[in-house]
Curated annotation (Swiss-Prot):
Subunit structure of this chain's protein: Associates with the 50S ribosomal subunit.
Binding-site residues for GTP 1, renumbered to this chain: 9-16, 56-60, 118-121
InterPro entries given in the database record: G_ENGA, GTP-bd, GTPase_Der, KH_dom-like, KH_dom-like_a/b, P-loop_NTPase, Small_GTP-bd
Entry keyword Nucleotide-binding: yes
Protein name per its UniProtKB record: GTPase Der
Physiological role: GTPase that plays an essential role in the late steps of ribosome biogenesis.
GO molecular function annotations of the record: GTP binding; ribosome binding
Residue ranges of domain EngA-type G in the record: 3-166, 203-376
Keyword annotations: GTP-binding, Nucleotide-binding, Repeat, Ribosome biogenesis
Annotated organism of origin: Shigella flexneri serotype 5b (strain 8401)
Domain (KH-like) ranges: 377-461
Any one GO BP annotation for this protein: ribosome biogenesis
Residues involved in GTP 2 binding: 209-216, 256-260, 321-324
Similarity field: Belongs to the TRAFAC class TrmE-Era-EngA-EngB-Septin-like GTPase superfamily. EngA (Der) GTPase family.
Length: 490
């Protein structure tokens, strides 16, 4: 599960500035749902290759007496769902009553909390933080988020050790594996069999979407049809529910972000939406089903979720629910709107269903299996290089400064999603249009459907670049004789 870091504190203490610092390697804004999350922002960040979700909870300006209400409205859910809390205060404003009330609440939650004193630039470090020791939160970390001072130390001494304890990184060098495979093929050696068999593992399927689109109805419809094995494995308070099931001889793990409830207790009015659960379910899934309400059409929230799914590289099946009862004219309008707003998602199957009545639900799993198979299929270096060569023969790369971009060979760089690494000269100068052409060519040639495909380019290195040739003693003697001969004949 992807770890979660929540930034809390009063307004204008610099939470958004630190949020942007932490998420600078990714798109800072992942989802912004006014009215549902009370202006909280969710972003993906990275420390030395370890990803985590960062939450900017917005300002809490309550007093000692009323802070609990304000916390419940804006930040309580984020704090409960977070693995660690960075509590930010303002060194220039000094200790405020709201700071004390927030600290009291955090101490009562027994959540790992680190006190970050911002805006310490231009102040005496010792004097700037001394008042905040009374909050009883242990060591203090002074920073100046706007200038980046102290942020690196915060990452190295707080977040990185905490993430290592929470989720130790597996010491697996996939690149070495791929290069070993490539060299073996180049030398004519037999390619070693990959021990990993994706067909032997259950497909993790996440059903996500906005509130009231029918996620729970669809979940229970799926579980109610040809159900073989169903039992709940509840995790912590912030975890989704994982439900193992079997369908048509294939094992699945259904990730329910809203929680599975008894059929009689399901009502759209009480279906709750947790952004964190949704984002974590997407990260943990192999295939994501995005459920859209046909009567409401595509919303900005749907597009935000789509953006996160694409950034995560997950396979995708789009489900348009509540299709029953619509007139033919309205159905045509809905399809036109989908084609217009989802034109950039040309690899995903779109299904029109009624979860309530079950129409179209049975066809979903064919697309789920297709998407999973496409994302996990193993393709050898020779095949990928052959496809790349055919693509170049059909449409050559453009000239760059009078020289043709040369693509040398291709190999697999990863799976789920499939990654093709292309080596060549001047590849950094390839225009985006040609990169899209290559991506579409590989997709068509490999018959990839339901899964995104990524193309990465690596520049060929000249081993003699910036190196001076060292002459041997014999070459030096020959050079001297040649120079004497040239001078003599001048």
């Amino acid at each position: 599960m992807v770890p979660v870091v929540a930034l809390v504190g009063r307004p204008n203490v610099g939470k958004s500035t630190l949020f942007n610092r932490l998420t600078r390697t990714r798109d800072a804004l992942v989802a912004d749902f006014p009215g549902l999350t009370r202006d909280r922002k969710y972003g993906r960040a990275e420390i030395e290759g370890r990803e985590f979700i960062c939450i900017d909870t917005g300002g809490i300006d309550g007093t000692e007496d009323g802070v609990e209400t304000r916390m419940a409205e804006q930040s309580l859910l984020a704090i409960e769902e977070a693995d660690v809390v960075l509590f930010m205060v303002d060194a220039r404003a000094g200790l405020m009553p709201a700071d004390e009330a927030i600290a009291k609440h955090l101490r009562s939650r027994e959540k790992p909390t680190f006190l970050v004193v911002n805006k310490t630039d231009g102040l005496d470090p010792d004097q700037a933080v001394v008042d905040f020791y009374s909050l009883g939160l242990g060591e203090i970390y002074p920073i100046a988020a706007s200038h980046g001072r102290g942020v690196l130390s915060l990452l190295e001494h707080v977040l990185l050790p905490w993430m290592e304890d929470l989720a130790p990184q597996e010491e697996v060098d996939e690149d070495a594996e791929y290069w070993a495979q490539f060299e073996a093929e180049e030398n004519g050696e037999e390619e070693e069999e990959d021990d990993f068999d994706p067909q032997s593992l259950p497909i993790k399927l996440a059903i996500v979407g906005r509130p009231n689109v029918g996620k729970s109805t669809l979940t229970n419809r799926i579980l109610g049809e040809e159900r073989v094995v169903v039992y709940d494995m509840p995790g912590t308070t912030r975890d989704s529910i994982y439900i193992p099931m079997e369908r048509d001889g294939r094992e699945y793990v259904l990730i329910d972000t809203a929680g599975v409830r008894k059929r009689g207790k399901i009502t759209d009015a009480v279906e709750k939406f947790s952004v964190i659960k949704t984002l974590q379910a997407i990260e943990d899934a192999n295939v994501v089903m995005l459920v859209i309400d046909a009567r409401e059409g595509i919303s900005d929230q749907d597009l935000s979720l789509l953006g996160f799914i694409l950034n995560s590289g997950r396979s995708l099946v789009i489900v348009v629910n509540k299709w029953d009862g619509l007139s033919q004219e309205v159905k045509e309008q809905v399809k036109e709107t989908l084609d217009f707003r989802l034109g950039f998602i040309d690899f995903a199957r779109v299904h029109f269903i009624s979860a309530l009545h079950g129409s179209g639900v049975g066809n979903l799993f064919e697309s789920v299996r297709e998407a999973y198979d496409s994302s996990t299929r193993r393709v050898g270096t020779s095949m990928l290089t052959r496809i790349m060569t055919m693509a170049v023969e059909d449409h050559q790369p453009p000239l760059v400064r009078g020289r043709r971009v040369k693509l040398k060979y291709a190999h697999a760089g990863g799976y789920n999603p499939p990654i093709v690494v292309i080596h060549g000269n001047q590849v950094k100068d390839l225009p985006d249009s040609y990169k899209r052409y290559l991506m579409n060519y590989f997709r068509k040639s490999l018959d990839v459907m339901g899964s995104p495909i990524r193309i990465q380019f690596k520049e060929g290195e000249n081993p003699y670049a910036n190196k001076r040739n060292t002459l041997t003693p014999t070459q030096m003697r020959k050079r001297k004789r040649l120079m004497k001969h040239i001078k003599k004949n001048k």
